[in-house]
């Protein structure tokens, strides 16, 4: 074990036994047995019966990366079984989240006998009741929290219904993947990779079965070079969990964020296409949507006069022309820039304001929304992020009260796990051994590294806006938007390690986020 890894596991309080478990190789035998899911055999038999009887089957998904991946997994599963089925990704704007009564009527009118929900359904009580009235069986596969009694349907496959096993939150695509294994009788590695992508994008805790499937998904993409996914990568030559979270997932999510009609289904078409020509046509469309999403988000952020909120405890901003799907991205940018809680809102139907909230540790946004329940139509979320809707008439009082709730609150950012290292620790060989601890993510955060550097090694670039330089012969650094200060003495750089590629050459780099 090298010096870098020793310092990391010491800081993370990881024992030698835990370390060995974390870095050990995984294979397909490491996957969870699908039979751990209650009712999965019932679901499998009903689907086999439907195939035998030539029934029409509809997969009903969701517009985020998890729902799109889950839909793609089951659609490809049926394709491998040589059975044609339908699928539908609802529009965030036209249909809303989850299967609804109107869509059940439409599905029924087209002669479907069986609906399989993926990544939705557990809270869609009225729609499932409607399906039963129309003699449509529903196999409900979902992972969202069960808040009320179980809905009435043919059967439910859900992580929290497992028997004789510790509950671990798993995403909708993971549940769909387990069902695919039961139907196919084997593990398809492309479907596994889609499930691992969704596990990362839906921020599932990276331990136990979630950790195993993500490790397998990364390895599968590295080995099999799936064109559909690699074409969505910013750097396809270096694949890790960040490839999924920062490169592929945002692109998969883009269509659901801003497309207001059924074209959101093109993302499933892309992920399930076998034709290179069709892939390239769809990819061109996807890339145009990604660019549009970035433009909308950036322009919305630029419209905010942050100085006008200097005296506010909570930033509350209403946008006239920003779509609901990007409002959370804007809220996150505001939070990162201002370091104070924010609520970003846009106009929905009939003057109703819909939006997203973001907060720092110290001000629980979910509790604040609960306290203001009488002013809101709906709300939900957790301590640092939430969503809400309210009538515009209630906006002034909402602003006043949420600012009052945040008065005197001491805010702090999430504490970084910082490992003190020397220049000699930062070598490519040491980094490669450290990388065996990956994947990092929810519940297993990637550490930051703190290293001392001479002021003479710091070079300002882009008219003094950014900094770069060398830490050692094998490690460089880059610091975006950190060039304003004067470097009159040696400093400590704090950042994360990454591999950069330029003209076919890979180098170790510290991406600096803080200077001390």
Q: Which stretches of residues belong to each language-model region?
A:
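Short aromatic-glycine-enriched beta-strand elements
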Residues: 461-469, 506-510
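Beta-strand/loop nucleic-acid-binding surfaces
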Residues: 472-487
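Hydrophobic helix-and-loop "lid/oligomerization" segment in the mid-to-C-terminal part
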Residues: 2-114, 134, 152, 184-400, ...
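OB-fold single-stranded nucleic acid-binding module
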Residues: 394-400, 487-516
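Beta-strand elements of well-folded, non-transmembrane domains
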Residues: 421-423, 438, 497-499
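Conserved phosphate-handling catalytic cores of large alpha/beta enzymes
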Residues: 107-108, 117, 122-131, 136-204, ...
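Non-catalytic interaction/regulatory segments
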Residues: 431-447
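Structural detector for short beta-strands of small beta-barrel domains
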Residues: 442-463, 491-497
């Amino acid at each position: 074990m090298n010096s870098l890894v020793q310092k990391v596991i010491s800081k993370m309080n990881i024992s030698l036994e835990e370390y060995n478990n974390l870095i050990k190789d995984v294979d397909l035998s490491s996957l969870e047995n699908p039979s751990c899911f209650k009712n999965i055999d019932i679901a499998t038999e009903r689907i086999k019966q439907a195939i035998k009887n030539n029934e029409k089957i509809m997969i009903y998904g969701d517009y985020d990366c998890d729902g799109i991946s889950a839909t793609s997994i089951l659609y490809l599963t049926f394709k491998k079984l040589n059975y044609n089925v339908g699928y539908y990704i609802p529009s965030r704007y036209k249909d809303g989240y989850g299967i609804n009564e109107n869509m059940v009527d439409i599905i029924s009118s087209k002669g479907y006998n069986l609906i399989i929900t993926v990544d939705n359904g557990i809270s869609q009580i009225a729609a499932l009741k409607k399906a039963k009235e129309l003699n449509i069986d529903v196999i409900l596969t979902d992972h969202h929290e069960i808040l009320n009694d179980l809905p009435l349907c043919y059967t439910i496959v859900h992580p929290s219904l497992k028997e004789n096993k510790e509950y671990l939150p798993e995403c909708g695509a993971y549940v769909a993947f387990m069902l695919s294994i039961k139907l196919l009788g084997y593990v398809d590695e492309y479907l596994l990779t889609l499930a691992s992508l969704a596990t990362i994008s839906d921020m599932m805790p990276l331990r136990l079965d979630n950790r195993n499937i993500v490790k397998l998904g990364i390895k599968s993409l590295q080995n099999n070079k799936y064109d559909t996914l690699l074409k969505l990568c910013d750097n396809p030559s270096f694949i890790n969990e960040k490839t999924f979270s920062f490169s592929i997932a945002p692109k998969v999510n883009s269509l659901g964020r801003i497309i207001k009609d059924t074209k959101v289904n093109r993302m499933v078409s892309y992920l399930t296409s076998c034709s290179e020509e069709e892939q390239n046509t769809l990819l061109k469309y996807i890339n145009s949507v990604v660019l549009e999403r970035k433009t909308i988000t950036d322009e919305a952020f630029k419209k905010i006069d942050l100085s006008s909120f200097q005296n506010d405890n909570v930033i509350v901003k209403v946008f006239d022309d920003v779509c609901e799907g990007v409002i959370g991205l804007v809220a996150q940018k505001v939070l990162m820039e201002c370091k104070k809680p924010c609520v970003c809102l846009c106009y929905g139907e009939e003057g109703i304001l819909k939006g997203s909230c973001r907060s720092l540790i110290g001000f629980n946004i979910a509790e604040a929304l609960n306290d203001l329940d009488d002013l809101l139509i709906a709300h939900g979320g957790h301590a640092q992020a939430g969503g809400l809707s309210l009538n515009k008439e209630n906006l002034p009082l909402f602003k006043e009260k949420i600012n009052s709730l945040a008065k005197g609150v001491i805010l702090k950012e999430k504490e970084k796990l910082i490992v003190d290292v020397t220049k000699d620790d930062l070598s490519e060989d040491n980094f490669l051994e450290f990388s065996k601890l990956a994947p990092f993510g929810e519940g297993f955060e990637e550490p930051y590294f703190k290293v001392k550097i001479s002021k003479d090694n710091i070079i300002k670039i882009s008219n003094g806006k950014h900094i770069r330089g060398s830490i050692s012969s094998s490690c460089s650094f880059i610091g975006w938007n950190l060039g304003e200060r004067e470097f009159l003495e040696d400093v400590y750089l704090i950042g994360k390690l990454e591999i950069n590629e330029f003209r076919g050459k890979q180098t170790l780099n510290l991406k600096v986020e803080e200077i001390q």
